Amino acid sequence: MTNTWNRLALLIFAVLSLLVAGELQAGVVVGGTRFIFPADRESISILLTNTSQESWLINSKINRPTRWAGGEASTVPAPLLAAPPLILLKPGTTGTLRLLRTESDILPVDRETLFELSIASVPSGKVENQSVKVAMRSVFKLFWRPEGLPGDPLEAYQQLRWTRNSQGVQLTNPTPYYINLIQVSVNGKALSNVGVVPPKSQRQTSWCQAIAPCHVAWRAINDYGGLSAKKEQNLP
């Protein structure tokens, strides 16, 4: 009986720990999961909401992408700015983060450009019991979208071409839009960190190197953070 109560107590403690962590991570809610910056706009706004009972200091910045497989590396500074870089959100309040264009004329006009929007939140209250509260950082995809691009960005994933070669599978994206892959599987095996396929480019992968038949299935994430219909293909 004692062992049963001990196991129950441990289970309750574990659940409560998860709930506390969830509340802490949900202290600041960002109004979106990905963002589109149309080239005909001078700025876009993002709503930040503090749902917790403590104040948070928000630090935001825009960088070139580094963390998504298939992303195009660049050492050129991002010609976009997050303002203000620091925002204090008191309990139960909202704030607005503005993304501004600075030198957008250096960006391609025939395709999208991908950036990272990094938003870190730090509890701004006093340090208690000599403990330090660390920042929680979230990174969002930010797409710069030039005017007049042909085609429908919501349908771009349907034009993605998959071709086998001696190195694996080559992905070809003929559209001017980024294709953000998700739920990709090869012969029924799910793949992780499948990343993106940049516009008007090819991406080589090591998938399907074996001689055996190769069946691929995938979805894409659209402008609104939703999932596309599932696509499947047998690769000879």
Swiss-Prot record:
It is found in: Periplasm. GO terms for cellular component: outer membrane-bounded periplasmic space. Part of the elfADCG-ycbUVF fimbrial operon, which promotes adhesion of bacteria to different abiotic surfaces. Could be required for the biogenesis of fimbriae. Gene3D superfamilies: Immunoglobulins. Keywords: Chaperone, Fimbrium biogenesis, Immunoglobulin domain, Periplasm, Signal. The operon is cryptic under classical laboratory conditions, but is functional when constitutively expressed. Belongs to the periplasmic pilus chaperone family. Its main location: periplasm. One of its GO terms (molecular function) is protein folding chaperone. Induction: Expression is negatively regulated by H-NS and subjected to cAMP receptor protein (CRP)-mediated catabolite repression. Residues 1-26 form the signal peptide. One of its GO terms (biological process) is cell wall organization. InterPro entries: Ig-like_fold, PapD-like_sf, Periplasmic_pilus_chap, Pili_assmbl_chap_C_dom_sf, Pili_assmbl_chaperone_bac, Pili_assmbl_chaperone_C, Pili_assmbl_chaperone_CS, Pili_assmbl_chaperone_N. This is Uncharacterized fimbrial chaperone YcbF.
